[in-house]
Every structure is written in structure tokens, then in C-alpha cells.
Regions:
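Bacterial N-terminal signal peptides that target proteins for export
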Residues: 1-11
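Bacterial N-terminal signal peptides
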Residues: 10-19
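Domain-level marker for long, solvent-exposed, non-transmembrane regions
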Residues: 22-161
Length: 161
């Protein structure tokens, strides 16, 4: 091979490497993290690991609590380990989200009654993780949900028997 051919091969390889490295960089990826039961207590409360998003950390924490209670009522929650039983939804009615939408809107309103049935499980500094993006904050934490209290409320409201 001549010197001219070697230069052409090196130039072609350099252009190929540069072209391959000029891909679109993904800045944010969507992850669908499902809530999971971390532990259960004898008083009917469940510690649930969940995610919430908001404009600031306080709003994200409130959304995290709403999400945990919502999942318990309407969707059920999977267990994080094999020695804890998964939790079925409290409302087993078909189309429960649509049927009880008015009740749910009042219950989950800002400052709503849902706050009486959940609390931050671990109050130590650093127990919740916050991830900041350009426009929002995403929070991951563990929330204690009073499932026994929620069942009693739903029975009292006539939603479940």
C-alpha cells in the first residue's frame, strides 16, 4: 500500500468514528417505577416505596403520599420481597376509578382527607431521594399508609361492604 492509500484509509476511519459518535444524547429517560410494599405493621399500616413529582420538593412529597394512597385504594400494591404478601385494591368494583371519581377528587384534593391516612415513614434526613430536572423535582421515599383506616372509611362511605 502506498502512502496515499494509507492516508485515505486513516481519514475514512476518522470520519467514520466521528460520525458514529455524533448521535443524539438522551437527556431524560422515562422510568415507570411501580409502588412496592416494603414492610407491614401489626396495626394495619403498610410501608410503601413510591415516587412523586412536583415543582418543588414539598409538592413532590405530597404527590408521593397521594400516589401511595391512590395505589392502595384503586390498583393494589406489589410486594418488594417474597415474605410480604401483595396488597389487592381496596375497591374491587369494575371501573371503580370512573364510578367513584367525584369522591376521589374530594378525597385527594390539596389538603384533602388522604393526609389523615398516610405519613412519611422514615423521617431521618436523607431518607427520601430528590432528583431535580429543568422544570420539576422527582421524589422517591417510603410512606406509611393506614390500610385498616382506609378500609373503615370506605365502608363508612358505603363504597365497599
Amino acid at each position: 500500500m502506498t502512502m496515499k492509500t494509507n492516508v485515505k484509509v486513516l481519514l475514512f476511519a476518522a470520519i467514520l468514528i466521528i460520525a458514529a459518535s455524533c448521535g443524539v444524547k438522551v437527556s431524560q429517560t422515562y422510568y415507570d417505577q411501580k409502588p412496592q410494599i416494603v414492610s407491614t405493621e401489626l396495626d394495619g399500616t403498610y410501608a410503601i416505596s413510591c415516587w412523586g413529582t412536583g415543582r418543588n420538593s414539598d409538592e413532590a412529597m405530597k404527590e408521593l403520599q397521594k400516589q401511595a394512597v391512590y395505589e392502595v385504594i384503586f390498583n393494589g400494591v406489589a410486594s418488594a420481597s417474597s415474605n410480604i404478601q401483595s396488597l389487592k385494591p381496596l375497591i374491587l368494583t369494575v371501573n371503580a376509578k370512573d364510578k367513584y371519581a367525584e369522591w376521589a377528587n374530594r378525597f385527594f384534593a390539596d389538603g384533602g382527607e388522604y393526609q389523615n391516612y398516610c405519613s412519611k415513614h422514615d423521617r431521618r434526613t436523607g431518607s427520601s431521594k430528590f432528583y431535580k430536572t429543568a422544570n420539576q423535582v422527582k421524589c422517591q421515599g417510603v410512606v406509611s399508609v393506614d390500610v385498616a383506616g382506609l378500609k373503615a372509611l370506605l365502608k363508612e362511605s358505603g363504597i365497599i361492604k
